[in-house]
């Protein structure tokens, strides 16, 4: 999804970092290519990662993340499961590799980091990071604001018609 693609895109801009966009859907390879990222299906992904960022919202994806992390690696969980129970094999690689599972609330900034920048500073930085034409690959549709009520029903019940479904549907105001 958009959160995972953005996280991978931003991480890839850090010198010396090896990033791989991983998905179960081979159609996501085109998105990865547009973002300049290497792509792998989960079964073919590079193992022994120091940090694995998981953002699929699928419990099986989180289970896979545990297998991709290196010894004493960190899995950063960015998914939101709501009230869904997520089964995890905590007795296998999680335990033997001494893995760290850390949650991230994408809607907020941790109190320890909040004072460093004001809301306006964080927003300006985020908007400047989004000002990259490659990120247009994440836009899978566009509609006028007036169509939003009908559009929400459509987007929540049917795929957008693209092979990868709806990633980010832009609303024109």
Residue spans for each PLM region:
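Conserved acidic E/D residue at the C-terminus of a beta-strand in Rossmann-like folds
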Residues: 23, 54, 105
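Helix N-cap at the beta1-alpha1 junction of Rossmann-like dinucleotide-binding domains, i.e.
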Residues: 25-28, 59, 82
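A short acidic, Gly/Pro-enriched loop at the edge of an enzyme's catalytic core
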Residues: 44-52
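Glycine-rich phosphate-binding loop and adjacent beta-alpha segment
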Residues: 63-128, 170-173
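C-terminal hydrophobic helical "lid"/dimerization subdomain
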Residues: 117-173
């Amino acid at each position: 999804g958009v959160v995972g693609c953005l996280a991978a895109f931003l991480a890839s801009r850090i010198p010396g970092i090896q990033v791989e966009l991983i998905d179960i859907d081979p159609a996501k390879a085109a998105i990865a290519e547009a973002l300049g990222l290497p792509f792998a299906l989960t079964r073919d992904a590079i193992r022994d990662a120091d940090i694995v960022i998981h953002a699929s919202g699928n419990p099986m994806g989180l289970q896979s993340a545990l297998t991709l992390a290196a010894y004493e690696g960190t899995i950063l969980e960015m998914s939101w499961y709501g009230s869904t129970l997520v089964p995890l094999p905590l007795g296998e690689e999680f335990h033997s590799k001494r893995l760290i599972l850390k949650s991230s609330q994408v809607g907020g900034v941790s109190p320890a980091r909040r004072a460093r920048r004001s809301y306006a500073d964080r927003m300006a930085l985020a908007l400047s990071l989004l000002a990259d034409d490659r990120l247009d690959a994440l836009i899978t549709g566009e509609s006028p604001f007036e169509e939003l009520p009908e559009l929400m029903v459509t987007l929540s019940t049917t795929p957008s018609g693209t092979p990868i479904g709806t990633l980010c549907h832009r609303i024109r105001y």
